[in-house]
Amino acid sequence: MTGNETRDREPAWVNLLNFMIHQEMEGRVSIQLDFLPNFGLIFSVRVLEELKTTIEVLKGQESQRLRTFCTSNCMEPRRDLDSFGRFLMIGTLDELVVDYAARMDIKTKAGMEPGGAIKAVANDLYSLRWGPIDTPIFNLLGLFMQIIPDFRCKYISLADFLINAKVPVDGRDLSGSTALSHCYSTKPGFDLEYAELLYKAGGEVNNRNRYGTTTAHEIAQVYNRSDPSSVQKATKALEWFLSHGGNADIADGDGISPRSICAAIKYMVPQLLAVIEKEDTRRALRGNTCCSLCGRAPSADEKLLMCGRCKKGRYCNPKLRACQKLDWPKHKKECKAL
């Protein structure tokens, strides 16, 4: 019996599955396999274009395929920048001020009150995206700092102006990463001054991207573990992350946390796990006076909210931070035990 005759006698679903696996290997689709009682093995297929439009945390092959796309494609100034993006790249603050005034003038002439016009212009600027991975405005400025480091101070001034103009700093690119996530991940950005600026403007250090990872996941994956400068940079970045409310136990879509990565490489890079354990001790000493997830103590006019079920977990106000939501996958095991 020939190979073709054998394939002809195979069930249709086997031929279809083989075809779809071949398509996935070529990067055209993503296959999700599941086993359902009474139905057996089923699979669902999502093409890359569909993955781009979804918002949920991805895992497995879907996560890897979107990651591959985002790391293989980037914003190229000559190809992707419009006129506004090009003058941002030049870094002239005076021109940005003039552009902003013109946008405000359009809104007020349309009948908006000053407060409404400020919000509308801020939303317009927040909504802007460039390139194949939908780079937002603060991410764009961070990228410019990598491309033209001599203009870095100019880009910081532009970012500061936009922050004062009430433009939110939490815009996400196609990977779900914010400007804050990019600028201290160490791959390739490491700019703690820009990170501090974005953090004070409301940036969330525990932001999870489309793969479910926080910046700490990237920091923990030190590419060159034998290079002292790489290890030192990663250690400093992790210290900044934790000291600004970062949590090392938030798991990605496949259940892996920064703590588990640091524990796995502790014999090669012991500094990272040591940083986490030092922060564990600091937060433990604070006891019930700090948030269970981020370790922040509330300000004088705020108070921590307790888990309604176990009364043990304490969290920041959900209107300010999503600490309880982020901690739930870990806390629910302890909560049920209680």
Model feature map: region roles:
Residues 3-140:
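N-terminal segments that cap or nucleate solenoid repeat domains
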Residues 76-85, 113-147, 171-186, 208-225, ...:
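Ankyrin-repeat boundary/"N-cap" motif
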Residues 95, 154-158, 190-194, 237, ...:
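Conserved ankyrin/ankyrin-like repeat signature
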